[in-house]
Every structure is written in structure tokens, then in C-alpha cells.
């Protein structure tokens, strides 16, 4: 893609440009926001302005057109989310990039954010409005590794501002990254200083890198003390004279060091087993799930839990002989809005959607309608193909949440969406209108993750083993970003969807190995065993992008040692029903997992009916249906069975067909 690079003059924006080129993109223009005249340091939440005197030389060194705009706005909207607001400094960025797009025809924007959600959210907001793709290849990279890469890739940058305990303007201004690397690591270990300066501890100016055709030379400068604080003085360099010099030798840009592919190779190499079923390397459909065409499922709603959760299941458009996916999606949302309004809620209260489609070929057309019903932070979503009744193209089961009363111990309520749209090496950007995760207090509801290579958004080839390793790693990356310290070991419930029955043991072994690795790392848990939710494996016909594996997790940021669980198995003539309840350590979240296992000797239809009969008997004795139910309908039917007057369920009852026979 043709890329405009947002530059501050610092190391991060420069190294992200190098990553863009390594990924096959072409930098065609530079863009910079500068302070008003006679101003060096601007009180901005978004932009680095120290060293702005060098930006013109920076562009000349790269032989690229430079677009600059003076920052007129201020930091007005400083919340987690951003909405267009006149007078905000973010709107200066919008107008700058709008001009560059009109003049240069760029398709993407390079941004050097490493850890700042504040900056990422605002750049993504602007890019969405301008239909540009943000490229943030440094996003959530390990900072020590990243700093080492910058130095080893011949990025020469000087420290031009310091503002942290342990950094002294008189000692450290003007030093190179190579000279500072060891000391910055020491500060990180002692005081928690961000090695790459993501907390504003220091700022840099790049004088040379492999993308430069000439290098910048500083002739004269002065030190300005902004604050003479005894513990954390703030000072910066002001440059009065600089020039460019021809480079006698140029270092080559490393093009074979993609962190995504390196980590993928490492993950699969560490898998000590091989699965013959995975050797074919391609996923195939699993057509043995059947559904009769008669009957229509009605929307149903669970009782509200004490913490404000409720399920709304069976949302779909009316069945018809010649259905259209977009019309049926609109009709489904009309029904959804009506049901939600009856509760006194809005669509913004939805935190998780289970979306079932009759054909994955409708994925793009459905998304084009789906996205119009949600704002900038849509709910997390899990999308799979399922055998729906004839004429029904989709079904949605939605988990809603609204605050009820006060939190336990008067703790504040928190709800936060992780909706990353930038291409990076971290985890896949969204391929649809959903958030990677929604966090409500201690609970984290993750979207389904498939094995897309983050920097290319292409599906990883090689079969279920490799895809399971990568999709599980993506899920853990999302968990850690949503809530620091969260791992797969904090899962209360995990669903893994596969498209081949033979891949069930493959994903189970990957899951088990991952948990064993976590237990080995977390010896601080002591002798008490940490309890992780069960992995329920479901065989479905198809997954988005033709993936072989999709993982969905609900997690809780509690102490897994303090969880409690119980398990009950009920035998039936045609198979078995296993119910597992897991209660979080804080007693605020709980999940109920039900898996139905058919005996190999049981006829499919009769066995299914027999298990459902036994299931209903266990949960209230409703008669069995006259027809077998499709996979998503089981959740709805069980939901209707559970609603008894005067009882409130905690957590959710989630019923799936396990991929075993």
C-alpha cells in the first residue's frame, strides 16, 4: 500500500516506517503536526513537539514530500474513547491526513504507537473517517526487544528530552540509544521506567537510519531546563543549527525479520507431538450436522442476574423460501432492538454476540448491515457456520449487561472495549464489526480468534495444529491487553470450534500443553491448584476465512487458586450429559458448561432426541421436541427450560455438541 508516515522525528515513528517497508508497503509522504511559532514544548496528550526544528531536514534526508500543519486545537476529549469534536487537537490530525490523501492518494498511515491506547484510539478514529488503514507494527511489542532491534538495525537516535526519576538533563541529553540501552534497562528493573519511553520518560530525535539517503548532523544546540525538580528534572535540547551530509555507506534494511512469523515458527517447533490427521494441511467441512426445515424458533430472554447480565437468544429474521441475507439481517436487528427496548436497554448494552450463519459465503454481506447498528466500540463476537432451519440465514444469541445497584464493597464499575483496527505484529485487527474483547469489571469476553497472521491478515497455512497454536496465542494476547496479567489460565470457559472431527484431539493437546506451560511459569500459585475452565470443542461446517480453528474465551481476572467447581455426569441410553460449574475466586462470575456425547452405536436423530429428553428432565422436565434441534437452538431451548419463577441464574448455561462421538 501507499503509506503516509506520521513522524515526530523520534525513534518510534522512524522504526515503524522501517517495519512498513519490510512488510512490503511504500512510504510516499511524511506528515507532521508542529507547535505554534516560538514554541518548543507543547502540552499535548497526542504529539511530540520537542525537536520539531529538525523535521524539514528529516524529509529532505528521505527525499519525500512533507506535509505539516500547526496544532490549533487542545486536548479536550481525553477519555478512553474519542468522538469527533471541534477544537480538539485530534481534528488537526484529521485535516492534515485528509490533505495528504487528496494530494498523494495514500491508502494507509504509519503510526509509531507502542503502548498508548490513547494515541492508537484517536489515530484509528481519524483513519476510519478517512478510509485509511493504520499500520502500527510496534503495538504492544516487548520494549526491551524493540529497543534492541532499533539499535541493531542501525537506527541512530539521540535523547533530546528527559522527564523521569533517574534521568538527568545534564547527564543524559544528547546520548545515543546505544549508549543509553543498558542504563534504561536498569531503570526499568528498579523503578518501572518504560525502556522505550512510552510513559513520557524521554524523547528522541532520529539522525540516521537505513531509510535515510542523507544523515542529519547537529552543529549547535542548547539545553533548556523546563523543571528543576530535585527528583525528576525535566529538560530538553533546542537545536539552533543543523545540516545534512551524504552517507558514505548505507546499511541494508532487514526484510526477513517479521516478529509474527518468528513467533509462529517458535510456537509450532515447541509442539513436541505430531498429529497424522493434521498432515493433510487443509480444513474440510463437516457435513454431518443436520437440521430439519420445519418449525420456527422464538426469541427468548433469561432472567437478569444479580450483577446485571441476561441472555437474549434466538434472534433471527423470518424464514422464507428465497431469503436475502441483508434483508434478513435488518429484520433480525429490528427484532433485537424491539426486545432490547422492552428491557429498557439499548444495543450498546450488548457485550457479546454469538452469530450463527447458514452459509459463511454471506459473511461480508451480513457485516455490511451488521456494522450500521453499532458505534465505535461494538460488542465482542463469535461467528460460525451452523445448520439452521431452511430459509433462516442467521441467528444471534446476545449477552447484555447493565449496571444494577452498587458494586460489592463500593468498588467502581468499569466497562472497556478493546477494538484494535491497526495492522500490527500483536494480534489480528478486526475482520468485522466487533471488538476483540469487552471487559466488565473482572470479566473479559473475548471475540472468536482465528489464525490470521497479524501483519498480513492472511490465514496461516499448515492445518489445525499450527492454526490452534496461533489462535490460542492471539486469544492470550487479547486477554493480556484487556487486563494486565491475564492469561488463558484465567479462562472460566473456552469454546474451540473446528471443521473436522479428527482435529478435536489436536486442539485439546495444544490447549493442555498451553496450560501446563502456564502452570510451570506461575509457581507463585503455590501448592493449591489453579482451576481453569473447561475447553469444549465443537465441530461446525465452516469458519470465517476458511479457518480450521476458532477459539472463544470468557475469562475472569481473579485468583484461579480460589475458584470452586463441581462436575456431574448423567448417563442416558444414547450417550452422556456432563455438566461442569466453575465459580470465580471473587464469587462474582460463574459459568455452566454442558457437553452432550452421543454413543457411536446410537442413531443420530434418536440419540440426539434421547439426550435432549434427558437434558430437559434434569432442568425442569419439559417434553422433548418433535424434531432434532440445530446446534444454536439447543442454547435457546435450554434457556427456556431454565427460567423458573423466583430463580435467578448466575453466569450462563451454555450448551454445545462436543466434537467427540
Locations of the language-model features?
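Glycine- and other small-residue-rich loops at beta-strand/loop junctions that grip anionic moieties
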Residues: 111-112, 135-139, 196, 386, ...
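ATP-dependent adenylation/nucleotidyltransferase module used to activate substrates
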Residues: 1-159
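Short, surface-exposed amphipathic charged segments that create phosphate/polyanion-binding patches used
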Residues: 84, 146-156, 172-178, 394-400, ...
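Short, catalytically relevant binding-site loops at active-site mouths
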Residues: 115-118, 140-144, 165-166, 426, ...
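ATP/NTP-dependent adenylation/nucleotidyl-transfer catalytic domains that generate, transfer
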Residues: 1-2, 26, 38-41, 55-60, ...
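Short, polar/acidic, helix-capping and beta-turn segments at strand->helix junctions
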Residues: 267-661
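Short, structured patches in soluble enzyme cores that scaffold and shape functional sites
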Residues: 138-139, 159-162, 208-211, 398-400, ...
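Short glycine-/acidic-enriched loop or helix-start segments at secondary-structure transitions
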Residues: 15-16, 78, 119-122, 169-170, ...
Amino acid at each position: 500500500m501507499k503509506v503516509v508516515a506520521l513522524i515526530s522525528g523520534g525513534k518510534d515513528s522512524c522504526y515503524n516506517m522501517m517495519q512498513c517497508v519490510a512488510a512490503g508497503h511504500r512510504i510516499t509522504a511524511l506528515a507532521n503536526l508542529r507547535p505554534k511559532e516560538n514554541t518548543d514544548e507543547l502540552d499535548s496528550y497526542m504529539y511530540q513537539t520537542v525537536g520539531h526544528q529538525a523535521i524539514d531536514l528529516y524529509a529532505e534526508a528521505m527525499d519525500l514530500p512533507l506535509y505539516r500543519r500547526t496544532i490549533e486545537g487542545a486536548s479536550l476529549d481525553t477519555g478512553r474513547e474519542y468522538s469527533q469534536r471541534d477544537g480538539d487537537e485530534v481534528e488537526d490530525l484529521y485535516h492534515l491526513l485528509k490533505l495528504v490523501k487528496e494530494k498523494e492518494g495514500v491508502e494507509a498511515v504509519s503510526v509509531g504507537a507502542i503502548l498508548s491506547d490513547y494515541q492508537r484510539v484517536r489515530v484509528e478514529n481519524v483513519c476510519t473517517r478517512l478510509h485509511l488503514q493504520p499500520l502500527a507494527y510496534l503495538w504492544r511489542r516487548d520494549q526491551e526487544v524493540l529497543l534492541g532491534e532499533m539499535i541493531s538495525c542501525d537506527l541512530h537516535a539521540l535523547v533530546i528530552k528527559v522527564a523521569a526519576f533517574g534521568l538527568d538533563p545534564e547527564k543524559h541529553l544528547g546520548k545515543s540509544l546505544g549508549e543509553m540501552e543498558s542504563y534504561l534497562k536498569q531503570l526499568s528493573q528498579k523503578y518501572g521506567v518504560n525502556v522505550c519511553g512510552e510513559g513520557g520518560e524521554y524523547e528522541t530525535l532520529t539522525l540516521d537510519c537505513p531509510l535515510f539517503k542523507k544523515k542529519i548532523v547537529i552543529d549547535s544546540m542548547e539545553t533548556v531546563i523546563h523543571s528543576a525538580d530535585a527528583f525528576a528534572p525535566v529538560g530538553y535540547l533546542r537545536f539552533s543549527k543543523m545540516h545534512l551530509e551524504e552517507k558514505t555507506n548505507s546499511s541494508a534494511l532487514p526484510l526477513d525479520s517479521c516478529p509474527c512469523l518468528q513467533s509462529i515458527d517458535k510456537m509450532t517447533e515447541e509442539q513436541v507431538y505430531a498429529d497424522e490427521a493434521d498432515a493433510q494441511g487443509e480444513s474440510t467441512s463437516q457435513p454431518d450436522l443436520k437440521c430439519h426445515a420445519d418449525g420456527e424458533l422464538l426469541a427468548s430472554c433469561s432472567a437478569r442476574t444479580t450483577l446485571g447480565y441476561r441472555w437474549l437468544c434466538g434472534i433471527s429474521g423470518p424464514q422464507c423460501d428465497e431469503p436475502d441475507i441483508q434483508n434478513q439481517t435488518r429484520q433480525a436487528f429490528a427484532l433485537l432492538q424491539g426486545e432490547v427496548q422492552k428491557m429498557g436497554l439499548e444495543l450498546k448494552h450488548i457485550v457479546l454476540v454469538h452469530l450463527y450463519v447458514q452459509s459463511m459465503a454471506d459473511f461480508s454481506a451480513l457485516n455490511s448491515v451488521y456494522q450500521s447498528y453499532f458505534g465505535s466500540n461494538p460488542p465482542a463476537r463469535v461467528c460460525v457456520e451452523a445448520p439452521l432451519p431452511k430459509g433462516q440465514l442467521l441467528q444471534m444469541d446476545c449477552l447484555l449487561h447493565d449496571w444494577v445497584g452498587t458494586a460489592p464493597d463500593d468498588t467502581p464499575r468499569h466497562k472497556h472495549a478493546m477494538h484494535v483496527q491497526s495492522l500490527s505484529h500483536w494480534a489480528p485487527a478486526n475482520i468485522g464489526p466487533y471488538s476483540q474483547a469487552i471487559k466488565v469489571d473482572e470479566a473479559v469476553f473475548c471475540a472468536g480468534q482465528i489464525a490470521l497472521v497479524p501483519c498480513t491478515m492472511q490465514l496461516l497455512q499448515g492445518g489445525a495444529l499450527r492454526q490452534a497454536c496461533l489462535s490460542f496465542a492471539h486469544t492470550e494476547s487479547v486477554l493480556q491487553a484487556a487486563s494486565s496479567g491475564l492469561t488463558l489460565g484465567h479462562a472460566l470457559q473456552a469454546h474451540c470450534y473446528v471443521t473436522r472431527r479428527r482435529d478435536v484431539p489436536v486442539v485439546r493437546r495444544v490447549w493442555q500443553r498451553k496450560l501446563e506451560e502456564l502452570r510451570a511459569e506461575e509457581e507463585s500459585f503455590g501448592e493449591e491448584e489453579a482451576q481453569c475452565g473447561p475447553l469444549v470443542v465443537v465441530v461446525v461446517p465452516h469458519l470465517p476465512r476458511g479457518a480450521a480453528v476458532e477459539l472463544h474465551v470468557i475469562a475472569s481476572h481473579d485468583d484461579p487458586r480460589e475458584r470452586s467447581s463441581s462436575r456431574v455426569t448423567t448417563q442416558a441410553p444414547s450417550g452422556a450429559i456432563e455438566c461442569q460449574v466453575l465459580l470465580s475466586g471473587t464469587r462474582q462470575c460463574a459459568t455452566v458448561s454442558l457437553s452432550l456425547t452421543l454413543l457411536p452405536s446410537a442413531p443420530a436423530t434418536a440419540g440426539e432426541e434421547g439426550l435432549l429428553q434427558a437434558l430437559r428432565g434434569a432442568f425442569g422436565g419439559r417434553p422433548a421436541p418433535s424434531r432434532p434441534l440445530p446446534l444454536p437452538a439447543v442454547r435457546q431451548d435450554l434457556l427456556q427450560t431454565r427460567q423458573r419463577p423466583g430463580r435467578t441464574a448466575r453466569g450462563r448455561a451454555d450448551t454445545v455438541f462436543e466434537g467427540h462421538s
